[in-house]
Amino acid sequence: MLFTAFEDGGPMWTRSGPRVERCAVRFPTPFLGVPAVHVGLSMWDIAMDSNQRVDVSADEITPQGFVILFRTWGDTRVARARVSWMAIGPTEHEDDFLLD
C-alpha cells in the first residue's frame, strides 16, 4: 500500500489543492546503471463527489532505488492507493565474464 489516508484523516483525504505522497523504494539488488522504471496504479479508493485527478510517477531513479510520487490537486479526495512498479536494467550475474 502506498498510503492510506482515510482512517487517520490524512491530507490526501481531508485537504484540497496540490498534494503529494512520496515513497522511497530500494531495489533488492542494485543495478549496474540507472534502470528504466515503470510505475502504475494497481488500486485506488477515491471519493466520487468530485473529479478524480491523479498523477503517479517515478523520480530520483538511481541504480539503488527510486521514489514513487503520487500527486493530486483540486478537490480530489483519495482514501488509499497502491502502486505497482517494474525496473529493467543490467545487473551483476555469477556467470559474467569480466576483464581486468
Where are the regions a protein language model picked out?
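Extracellular attachment/recognition segments
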Residues: 1-100
